[in-house]
Amino acid sequence: MGKVIGIDLGTTNSAMAVYEGNEAKIIANKEGKNTTPSIVAFTDKGEILVGESAKRQAVTNPEKTIYSIKRIMGLMFNEDKAKEAEKRLPYKIVDRNGACAIEISGKVYTPQEISAKILMKLKEDAESYLGESVTEAVITVPAYFNDSQRKATKEAGTIAGLNVLRIINEPTSAALAYGLDKKESEKIMVYDLGGGTFDVTVLETGDNVVEVLATGGDAFLGGDDFDNRVIDFLASEFKSETGIEIKNDVMALQRLKEAAENAKKELSSAMETEINLPFITADATGPKHLVKKLTRAKFESLTEDLVEETISKIESVIKDAGLTKNEISEVVMVGGSTRIPKVQERVKAFINKDLNKSVNPDEVVAVGASIQGGVLKGDVKDVLLLDVTPLSLGIETLGGVMTKVIDRGTTIPAKKSQVFSTAEDNQPAVSIMVLQGERELARDNKSLGKFDLQGIAPAPRGVPQIEVTFDIDANGILTVSAQDKNTGKSQEIKISGSSGLSDSEIEKMVKDAELHKEEDARKKEVIEARNHADSLAHQTQKSLDEHKTNLNENDANEIQNAINALKECVKNDNATKAELEDKTKLLAQAAQKLGEAMANKNNAEQPKKKDDDVIDAEVE
């Protein structure tokens, strides 16, 4: 029998799991992460991006990046919740046969179609992980979802090519994941605070039965709302300091949104964090930077009413269940936003019991869904997933060439260094452009980041030794460092999620590399010929200036003319490899007389031999 995957189709993030080997296991997506952003983006080139790739480009494409589609799933256009969604969501919500839909570039999409694109990615990633076709799934929904919302969720699964065996409630699924169905009869509360929704449910468990006694929730209360409080605070502070209303700039607002989310996460473990957004906007006086410290105490004061609203919901649901707080025997915390310390503190204080946090709150619902799938279909074999670098990593060197440091397919963790040098005499700094891809030219690869190494001691080009080190740890965090071996000065950049690409992009880049292999090789040969010519012209000019008095006028003029001709050829972007090599050969022949004159006078200086470990690819 085929495997059944359990899917938590979340407002902000989605997750999937499979029941195998008598246990439920989370399935990592192709990016190596256990959760996938529930985001779909439409690019100007006609591409459709889903998940991490969609989230990454949200800053530059906010109007065509769809998130929180679950909030309008199965809603009629005239419902109050739909009107509330219109106020909060940046994309256009329209009426399609009385139901909510969205409009992107003049085309209308239903929430089911958008959700199906997320489910299709999950399905494809699960198939990649399991090594077989996946056609069946158990999908979870909030306990307060009505029939039309549940039907819409199932329709999304059908569009994605999945036979949805069961739609089950998220709190029921969470209870299964915690193994609460195996305990003696007791009453538990599931507190589920996700990225976009809040759900609190009281259940009675026992004799392998999980029964919902009462449930409540808010389709518009979640981690996003906590982020919005931080955004409003930062925007207000920025306006008071600069007079600029940053929220009117959609790209700046998206950067602010991402920074607020990161700050919220950091404050779950730290007491203070710094939001640093350089060049966030500009006015007549020049570029503006947003730098602000945010303490946990300030964050808690900004979001206090949101936390208290969840406590009010708890009180109502317990009352609806016909129980008192003292009759609740266990509290299960679900959803990524339950990591917020104040949330845990208030729930614990209200119920007066320790919280059950034994399973990852981001994964627990998907785990429970997979258990339900296991109940329906049975156990399956174990599968192991290994992580490797999906594409080569390197830096841009002289002439716009990508010089690889770590090759594609390298098992991580991995660390490798190469030594480069400068491109100009007395060059005080080098710029390190970190690249990812398989193409020969830097411009054809993905740029991951850039940093400068300052303070290089004055020296002729080719003499300084700059050691560049690529270090990928077991978490996939890439750190690139550069050190001047002479002065000891160093600089580094840390790049999270070194892939930086969707799988479709990875596949396209590998195919492009194969398709353009010969063309790229020819371009690289021209660049190498140009670099060699430039170096010869530079060195010969230097020697001629120093030893011109040892030559007769005709020989000196012949050499100078050959130098000038080669320099002009180097400057010509359309010069071919043959033309560059011909001019280089002519200069080399003319320069023989200079070498003879220098030898005859016995004052020639032998050029310092390069270190064998130094790569003959200079950094600009």
From Swiss-Prot:
GO terms assigned for molecular function: ATP binding; ATP-dependent protein folding chaperone; unfolded protein binding
Protein name in the entry: Chaperone protein DnaK
Species this chain originates from: Helicobacter pylori (strain Shi470)
Keywords carried by this UniProt record: ATP-binding, Chaperone, Nucleotide-binding, Phosphoprotein, Stress response
Ranges where the record places region Disordered: 597-620
PTM-bearing positions, type Phosphothreonine: 197
Biological function: Acts as a chaperone.
Signal sequence, renumbered to the chain: none
Taxonomic path: Bacteria, Pseudomonadati, Campylobacterota, Epsilonproteobacteria, Campylobacterales
InterPro entries: ATPase_NBD (IPR043129), Chaperone_DnaK (IPR012725), Heat_shock_70_CS (IPR018181), HSP70_C_sf (IPR029048), HSP70_peptide-bd_sf (IPR029047), Hsp_70_fam (IPR013126)
